[in-house]
Amino acid sequence: MESLFKRPFMVYGLAAGLRTVLLFYGAWQDAHSAVKYTDIDYMVFTDASRYVSQGDSPYARDTYRYTPLLAWMLLPTTWAIPGFFSFGKALFALSDVVAGWLVAKSLTLTHGMSAERALKYASFWLLNPMVANISTRGSSEGLLGVLVVALLWAVLNRRIYLGGVLLGIGVHFKIYPFIYGMSILWWLDEKEFTTNKAQSESREVKPKFKDTPVGIFISQILSFITPCRIRLTLISLLTFVALNAAMYLHYGTPFLQHTYLHHLTRIDHRHNFSPYSTLLYLTAASSAGAVGHDAGGPSGSFESLAFIPQLLISVVVIPLVLGKKDLPGTMLAQTFAFVTFNKVCTSQYFLWYLIFLPFYLPTSSLLRNPRLGIAVAALWILGQALWLQQGYLLEFLGISSFLPGLFLASLGFFAVNAWILGVIVADVGGLNLESGNEKRRVK
């Protein structure tokens, strides 16, 4: 096994081969089984592409809640060429492999690892059957993996302009990467202090005033406003606004409604691991039963209020506590918290944080303490298995298992994830700045 990682072409070949096998198996299962391998989201993507190919809006397809860019990218699925319907799956699978390659390169260039060791950790993504399964079923998360790892690499290498563009594209493509903005801005402080100390000193308030509470506060504000932070903020905002303006001019209000505003009041209780799922189910049921009546009330604001604890933890608390310790670890903790506390949590969302595992594992307690690592993996898988068992009763046997089965399973999985989040935060918080900076040093 050790010799495997000395041959990168073998690792990448295995990663590509695994996905190729799954693509062919998926085509066979779709043709011979009532239970389809292809994810329903892929059908939504390709239907939207078909509408675009006919000169219509992708939002003519019900439940298409994504940027038009995705429908444009999958236009080859509409071509009358045998096998091209799976073009999108192949693209997503290839993106998986590219994301893994970027992870390995980042570990080598910014973390000072040997190519062999970096590839070993990158294989937690490249050779992960769950990652391969999700992409070959037609989930587009691999594209986000490429964008997020490229963003991380750009920031760690001080490519501020590139980082700003990638952040803007990522947020346009799938909203959630906006959470990384805070941690990146906070992390840049350490670098800015060491490289632009003279500039910081030139912005200090007058000596007689700086020791007062107001003076200290003003000094802290001024020291936070640095050229790097300004450039990153402006470029990411300009990129995001430019993409949205172009899409709005082309598709109008439906673009804003379906791509962004829909998520504020989204009610999605199917295939949802979140403990909110049962409440969403009850909300959906009450809304359906309120035909001809006022459907307002507490349930009407529930979907929006669910964002408060999620955003407070992932956007404010974690970046401020961990941001200066280790950027990849902070981004992992942010993403894990965002997914755990999200009102909608599906298997695809797990890929959002799994992409950071290769950066986290080298210094994590999960490897230093194998028992802890095994317990984390076992409970995480068991939590999903219990939920899926209840979901099977509901989806395939027609047994109403929302209460108490699915609700208790969701609470159990949430508790497991909250515990794992605590482990991650403790690990990243335990790093000292010197070791973190040394680990990120470019050779």
UniProtKB/Swiss-Prot annotation:
One of its GO terms (biological process) is GPI anchor biosynthetic process. Its EC number is 2.4.1.-. Mannosyltransferase involved in glycosylphosphatidylinositol-anchor biosynthesis. Transfers the first alpha-1,4-mannose to GlcN-acyl-PI during GPI precursor assembly. Required for cell wall integrity. GO terms for molecular function: alpha-1,4-mannosyltransferase activity; glycolipid mannosyltransferase activity; mannosyltransferase activity. It is a multi-pass membrane protein. It holds the Pfam family Mannosyl_trans. It is an enzyme of class 2 (transferase). InterPro entries: PIG-M. Pathway: Glycolipid biosynthesis; glycosylphosphatidylinositol-anchor biosynthesis. Belongs to the PIGM family. The chain crosses the membrane at residues 8-28, 68-88, 90-110, 136-156, 160-180, 232-252, 273-291, 302-322, 347-367, 374-394, 406-426. Keywords: Cell wall biogenesis/degradation, Endoplasmic reticulum, Glycosyltransferase, GPI-anchor biosynthesis, Membrane, Transferase, Transmembrane, Transmembrane helix. It is found in: Endoplasmic reticulum membrane. Its main location: endoplasmic reticulum. This is GPI mannosyltransferase 1. GO terms for cellular component: endoplasmic reticulum membrane; glycosylphosphatidylinositol-mannosyltransferase I complex.
